[in-house]
């Protein structure tokens, strides 16, 4: 299978056809955007993202010869003109839904994220072992919605996504994402959180409450509920209630325990201490 064919299998193409192209064509100058032209435009974006230190995007369309000392390392004129590229960039839309009657700073991308998750939930079967973690989407404008700073990350500034991927065979495929909205999470006209999760409040079957972390764990693993598959997490997800909620939903969760003075609540720390007592580590 060629790279483009494999990419299109993994990409929510139906959403592009039904939403992106029609919504963009309502705004674009010149000829309507076609599906093939959209993939050319997207490919140019991906190609430019592979190179660092090119401060001016227009250099990719420069008429000057390629130089070892300055400018871009390639020219994109044979694929798309700079004017057409800018026209598409100005007109590109990722939703065809009207804005809600409350302030939602994520409205323009919410449908895109839902389309990605739905595509993988319907078309992809994750392996038996999966990894849930955080990912940073680098963004240098601190006024972007949901802007966060994590100094310990390689790219510390931008949007934080929680993401889950296959952990088997060393070939990870990310199959579900959730944008962390932080202080920009919207509320509806009644003052309640908009877009509530089905995993909030109390589990009717067990009577166990959902914490914020437990809610996130259940949301991110929803496509594999009832499968008996495993999700591995770092210490940020080491919440006993969350692990138990996953177990009740048919998913086995394991998380690194970051032990300080005391063991986490409900963990049989004394038994663990006795088991390792005298053993060589």
Q: Model-flagged regions — what are they?
A:
Residues 263-281:
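An anionic, glycine-rich sequence signature occurring as long contiguous blocks
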């Amino acid at each position: 299978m060629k790279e483009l064919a494999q990419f299109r299998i993994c990409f929510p193409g139906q959403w592009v056809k039904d939403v992106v192209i029609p919504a963009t064509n309502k705004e674009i100058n010149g000829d309507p955007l076609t599906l093939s032209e959209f993939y050319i435009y997207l490919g140019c974006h991906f190609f430019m993202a592979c190179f660092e230190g090119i401060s001016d995007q227009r250099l990719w369309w420069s008429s000057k010869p390629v130089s070892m000392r300055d400018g871009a390392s390639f020219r994109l004129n044979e694929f798309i003109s700079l004017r057409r590229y800018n026209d598409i960039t100005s007109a590109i839309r990722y939703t065809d839904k009207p804005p809600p009657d409350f302030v939602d700073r994520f409205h323009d991308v919410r449908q895109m994220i839902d389309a990605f998750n739905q595509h993988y939930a319907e078309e992809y079967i994750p392996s038996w072992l999966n990894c849930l973690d955080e990912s940073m989407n680098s963004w240098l404008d601190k006024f972007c919605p949901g802007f966060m700073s994590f100094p310990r990350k390689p790219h510390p500034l931008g949007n934080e996504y929680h993401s889950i991927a296959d952990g088997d065979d060393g070939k990870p495929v990310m199959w579900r994402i959730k944008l962390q909205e932080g202080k920009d999470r919207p509320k509806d006209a009644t003052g309640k959180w908009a877009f509530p999760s089905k995993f909030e409040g109390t589990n009717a079957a067990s009577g166990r409450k959902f914490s914020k972390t437990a809610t996130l764990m259940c949301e991110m693993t929803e496509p594999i509920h009832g499968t008996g598959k495993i999700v591995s997490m770092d210490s940020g997800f080491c919440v006993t209630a969350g692990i138990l909620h996953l177990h009740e939903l048919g998913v086995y969760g394991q998380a690194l325990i970051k032990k300080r003075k005391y063991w986490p609540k409900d963990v049989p720390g004394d038994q663990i201490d006795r088991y390792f007592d005298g053993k060589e580590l």
